[in-house]
Each structure stands twice: as C-alpha cells, then as structure tokens.
C-alpha cells in the first residue's frame, strides 16, 4: 500500500518530476553556503533552543534515506508488475544500505561525543535524504534497467567489468571514509584518556571533549584537511560508475559535491582561525593537488 498515493512510491511521471527537481534545486541550495556563514552542526554548532541532541539528531536526519529506499525496493516492483529484479539492482541497493548502516546507525553510537544539531540543519538533511532515496530507489526498483539485456545496454562496452570496478571504487571510498572518521574519533578518545589520568591523580572531574579539536596528521590527513569528505565522494563516484552512469546516481554524486565543497571551504577558514595559517597552509582542503 502506497504511503502517499502516486508519490511514495512515485509513478514514473512523478519520479521524473522529482528527479528533475532534485538535479536542479540542490546545487542552488548547497551553493547558498558560500554566502551564509551559519552552520548549526559540528565545530560550528551554537547554543539554541532549537538544537537536537547530537546522536539523536544525526540518526533522525540520516535514517530516512535508507528507510525510504528499502521501502520503495520492496513495494514498487510489485506495483508495476516486476516479479524479480536483476542481481545488479540488489547489489546497488545493498551498497546504499551498507553505507547508511554505518552513517545513520553505527556512526552516532561510536562517536566519543557529538555536538548538538540545529533543527534547520537536520530538516535540510532529511529533505536531501528523502529526495535522493526516492530518485535512486525508484530507479533501482522499476524505472531503470530491470532485465539482463537492459543492464547490458546501460553498462555498454564496460559490461560487468565496469560494474565490478565501480563496486571496488565504492569500497575503497567507504574504507577511507571510515578510517579517516576513526582518526577524528581517536583525537577525542586520546583527550578523554588524558583527562581521566589527570582527574584520577588530582581527584577532579573530567571535562567534556565535545569541543576538543586538533589538526589530525594520520593517513590522508597529512596532505589535506577533509579526506573523509573526499573519500565519500570516491564512494558515490564508484556507485555512479557501477550504475552505468545513471542520472539518479550522477545527481547524488554531484549534489554531495555541491553540499560538501563549500562546507570544506568554510571548514578550512575555521582551522586557520583556530590554529593559524602556518599550520594549515601546507595542506590541501579537499581535492588533492587541486584545492
């Protein structure tokens, strides 16, 4: 039973409309960050009555995407008369699920601390997730390749080799994203351990590590400030490749770039303000060898 008749899951006509809006609107929305300095999350979060607790807010703004995609994958094929989907569709849906199992569920659990998230930031993230998952999920469930010959045509000369290569690139990006996140987590774990030793020796309370920062130096952090962002781009580029360079996967990849690039740019300014130009200038921001 559809949750919203004609829209969730969408008819083909409505899916095409959503996909067009998704491609055109989010680059504009993401680019607003070049002129709006406020960002109520993470390093730049501030006290507000409209803040959500960090872990809860993160889960609530990340989980709608994978929930929507799985719902569409389980309902739309039957509505359009598809008995079974090719293995490629299931693999791509699985990759999406793996990513968000980490980002939506595991990530907030294993973070040593999380700053509050303003409800406006969370709301915009929910909108991103819903539009993206509706576009991708509908494509994988019914409106993209749904037979072996259609997949042969979509992948073209690259064939299965392109699909496998795309998956490999995806997993390289996923691993890079996780391990660079882990390096950021270790900064706060180390600070907490240091404080616990001091507290035990001097019988004082442990101070919160919510706002404890330093410039990380491990792995790609030696050369750039936001390798975890870059690795996420690598992930979704691989996904786009494996999908046969599909429009929904391209829109996801490009919209990630439009949203995250200005965030990295403002993040560099924050690092300079906190630690000085001398410690930051030798590092790229987000694209090695370019910016």
Which residues fall in each region the model found?
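Hydrophobic alpha-helical transmembrane segments in multi-pass integral membrane proteins
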Residues: 67-71, 129-147, 232-239
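Membrane-helix and juxtamembrane interface regions of eukaryotic multi-pass membrane proteins
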Residues: 1-127
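Alpha-helical transmembrane segments of multi-pass integral membrane proteins
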Residues: 95-96, 124-136, 165-176
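Hydrophobic transmembrane alpha-helices
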Residues: 1-34, 69-72, 85, 121, ...
């Amino acid at each position: 039973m559809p949750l919203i008749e004609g829209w969730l899951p969408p008819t083909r006509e409505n899916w095409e409309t959503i996909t067009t809006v998704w491609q055109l609107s989010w680059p504009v929305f993401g680019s607003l960050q070049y002129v709006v300095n406020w960002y109520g999350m993470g390093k730049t979060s501030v006290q507000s009555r409209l803040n959500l607790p960090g872990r809860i807010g993160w889960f609530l703004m990340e989980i709608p995407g994978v929930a929507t995609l799985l719902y569409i994958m389980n309902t739309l094929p039957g509505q359009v008369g598809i008995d079974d989907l090719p293995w490629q569709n299931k693999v791509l849906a699985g990759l999406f699920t793996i990513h968000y199992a980490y980002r939506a569920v595991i990530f907030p659990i294993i973070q040593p601390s999380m700053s509050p998230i303003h409800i406006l930031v969370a709301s915009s993230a929910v909108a991103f997730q819903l539009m993206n998952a509706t576009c991708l999920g509908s494509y994988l469930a019914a409106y993209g390749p749904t037979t072996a010959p259609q997949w042969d045509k979509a992948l073209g000369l690259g064939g299965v080799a392109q699909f496998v290569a795309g998956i490999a690139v995806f997993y390289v990006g996923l691993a890079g994203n996780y391990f660079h996140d882990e390096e950021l987590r270790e900064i706060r774990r180390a600070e907490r351990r240091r404080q616990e030793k001091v507290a035990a020796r001097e019988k004082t309370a442990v101070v919160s590590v919510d706002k404890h920062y330093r410039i990380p130096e491990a792995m790609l952090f030696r050369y750039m400030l936001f390798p975890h962002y870059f690795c996420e781009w690598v992930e979704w580029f691989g996904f786009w490749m494996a999908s046969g360079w599909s429009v929904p996967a391209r829109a996801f990849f490009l919209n990630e770039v439009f949203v995250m690039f200005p965030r990295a740019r403002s993040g560099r300014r924050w690092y300079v303000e906190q630690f000085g130009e001398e410690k930051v200038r030798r590092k790229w921001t987000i694209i090695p060898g370019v910016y």
